[in-house]
Amino acid sequence: MDSLVLASSSEYRLRLLKQLMIVPGEVISPDLDESVHKGELPRLYAERVAREKALKVFSSRPDKFVLGADTVAYCGRRIMLKTDDEAQATEYLEMISGRRHRVCTAVCLCAPTGDVRVRSVVSVVKFKRLSKDEIDCYIRSGEWKGKAGGYSIQGWASALISWMQGSHSSIVGLPLHETYCLLSGYFKLTHIP
């Protein structure tokens, strides 16, 4: 789909789009500050960052459709951002051990007409009570690096999740139903490319 640009550096988002039989013409990683604003609620944070990612790429590709997304995990109102720090990832895993937490993914589509549409999905995930050995082993695996909440549901962490409610694809990084709905407003998606 030459007229679609994916504003993301996530290989998982590209894979998920391909599940919809959509291959964007370009994939551009937006470089922006993803800091949380003081008092910002998790869902609003995800929606704002998804919008900013899409708009940043759209500013250089105004004749294209640009799709951006952002995923955030949170426990209560505490946002657990992506991390590359072992101590931070350990803290996240200790915090969600045996507890429910939420994962919100927002997706934004900017159209050449000037339309900017955002949708978001909140899912609930519950980890089993994690032992120190399980946390240490998971940290050694390294699969938590760069992941919201300090874990990757598509990896070994899936064995540590006792249940989830909501959209699996959203937890991975792109809510497929919502993405399909956004794109089908502009594209005929009922064909095989």
Curated annotation (Swiss-Prot):
Role this protein plays: Nucleoside triphosphate pyrophosphatase. May have a dual role in cell division arrest and in preventing the incorporation of modified nucleotides into cellular nucleic acids.
Cofactor(s) required for function per UniProt: a divalent metal cation
Coiled coil: none
Residues forming the catalytic site: D70 (proton acceptor)
InterPro entries to which the protein is assigned, alphabetical: ITPase-like_fam (IPR029001), Maf-like (IPR003697)
Gene Ontology terms for molecular function: nucleoside triphosphate diphosphatase activity
Location within or outside the cell: Cytoplasm
One cellular component (GO) term of this entry: cytoplasm
Protein name: Nucleoside triphosphate pyrophosphatase
Record EC number: 3.6.1.9
CDD domains: Maf
Similarity-based family: Belongs to the Maf family.
Keywords assigned: Cytoplasm, Hydrolase, Nucleotide metabolism
Pfam family, one: Maf
Catalytic activity as recorded in UniProt: a ribonucleoside 5'-triphosphate + H2O = a ribonucleoside 5'-phosphate + diphosphate + H(+); a 2'-deoxyribonucleoside 5'-triphosphate + H2O = a 2'-deoxyribonucleoside 5'-phosphate + diphosphate + H(+)
Species of the source: Anaplasma phagocytophilum (strain HZ)
HAMAP family the UniProt entry points to: Maf
Superkingdom classification of source: Bacteria
